[in-house]
Design a protein with these regions (language model features):
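Accessible peptide chain termini
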Residues: 1-2, 26
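Short, positively charged and aromatic/hydrophobic N-terminal segments
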Residues: 3, 10-18
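Residue-identity detector for glycine
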Residues: 3-6, 22, 37, 41
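Transmembrane and membrane-interface helices of multi-pass
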Residues: 14, 27-221
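Short, positively charged low-complexity motifs
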Residues: 19-26
Length: 221
């Protein structure tokens, strides 16, 4: 056991040396804001930093949307409904996948993490927000066919007065905080256009495959 543990530690140290090679005294400020002409080790560490945080923000937006969906109907037990999402790993993954995918797609298309967070938030929080008010005003949840009736719905919704509830305020505030974090602490993106184009194409391909596979299968989703 001791020998295996020693080998494991040596592997971690070796991989860390490779990642930060050429930048032994890498500081947090250089990790977040790599200067022009930074070494390859710094740029690798910066890309890893962006990848981890962008993934966490995309998943966080997905959880925020699920929470807002659980709060839509006051007649239902919100805690139990939200827990039901967490109790089914496959269903949870399918609900978190679109916001995460859109976060990466927005990043690859623009080269800026905050654009990915904004695109993910418009879908991952925007649609649950529309569903929240539709349940509050009409008593029935939002369906995919409702997207095709947005113009008509806009005329109908103008007749209602929307109440800014605590749940809505919290969701908007948290999304705003995520967006501000991405703007301030994830400012620099990948300048390699070819790599970003390949990444965007991969996101589109994954989205199409997921939609035609899991999301249209009633036995799965």
């Amino acid at each position: 056991m001791v020998g295996n543990g020693g080998c494991f530690c040596r592997k971690i140290c070796y991989n860390s040396v490779i990642l930060f090679e050429g930048e032994p005294d890498l500081k947090l400020s250089r990790l977040v804001f790599p200067p022009d002409g930074a070494s390859r080790g710094t740029l690798r560490a910066h890309r890893a930093y962006l990848a981890v945080l962008l993934t966490l923000l995309g998943v966080g937006i997905g959880f925020l949307g699920l929470w807002l969906t659980a709060c839509a109907d006051a007649a239902l037990p919100q805690a139990e409904l939200y827990r039901s999402y967490l109790d089914h790993p496959l269903l949870l993954a399918l609900n978190l996948f679109p916001p995460l995918l859109l976060a990466w797609l927005g990043y690859f298309l623009s080269g800026r993490c905050w654009c990915g967070v904004l695109l993910s938030g418009l879908f991952g929080v925007g649609l649950p927000l529309i569903n929240y008010y539709k349940v509050m005003l009409r008593g029935d949840p939002m369906r995919a066919s409702d997207i095709l009736l947005l113009r008509t719905a806009g005329g109908i919704m103008s007749q209602y007065e929307f109440e800014r509830t605590a749940e809505v305020n919290m969701a908007v505030a948290l999304l705003g905080a995520m967006l501000a974090f991405a703007v301030l602490l994830m400012p620099r993106g990948d300048k390699r256009r070819r790599a970003r184009a390949l990444g965007a194409a991969a996101c589109v391909l994954l989205g199409v495959v997921a939609y035609l596979g899991a999301y249209t299968d009633e036995a799965v989703y």
